Amino acid sequence: MSHLQAHMQRNNKESHSLSPFSQDSQHVTLPVECLEHGQGLELPHYATSGSAGLDLRAALAEEETVVLAPGQRALIPTGLVFHLLPGFEAQIRPRSGLALKHGITCLNTPGTIDSDYRGEIKILLINLGQENFSIQRGMRIAQTVIAPVVQVNVCAIEPDQKDSSQTPSNEGSRGADGFGSTGHD
């Protein structure tokens, strides 16, 4: 039995024997394909019962180290392919400890993994700190939050169209003000 099969079997028992693509009111199962260079790494899991994000790990070769100099960015493989259910996305977010202690964060945050994407999840990291930062195999480099997606129907309206029976009011309490218009305190 592969690492992935064992994890899915354990996960299914913990999720009341849900099939890999099922959901109930409490759980959505995320089938994860583990690529060859990701074999042996821990699958994403929640660190605590209240965690929103699943930790993602660097799937570098055993002897490989990626050194990010200040200001440098790199695309780090995770060795994982997510098989998301339609109606969900995976948001890629930085880990707060890496950001605070080392200035390491994700670019394009939150990054969106669409439900129909079937390529490897890779993390675009940047070093905003003052010192070099080394990334090695198995290091927790980011987190992913699985979230529902609402797709909308887009319709064009005329600037003076105010028929509230067809479209929401365009008279917002802020008007067109933005970028700090509500204050700085």
From Swiss-Prot:
Gene3D superfamilies: 2.70.40.10. It is an enzyme of class 3 (hydrolase). GO terms for biological process: dUMP biosynthetic process; dUTP catabolic process. Pathway: Pyrimidine metabolism; dUMP biosynthesis; dUMP from dCTP (dUTP route): step 2/2. It catalyses: dUTP + H2O = dUMP + diphosphate + H(+). Belongs to the dUTPase family. This is Deoxyuridine 5'-triphosphate nucleotidohydrolase. It comes from Bartonella quintana (strain Toulouse) (Rochalimaea quintana).
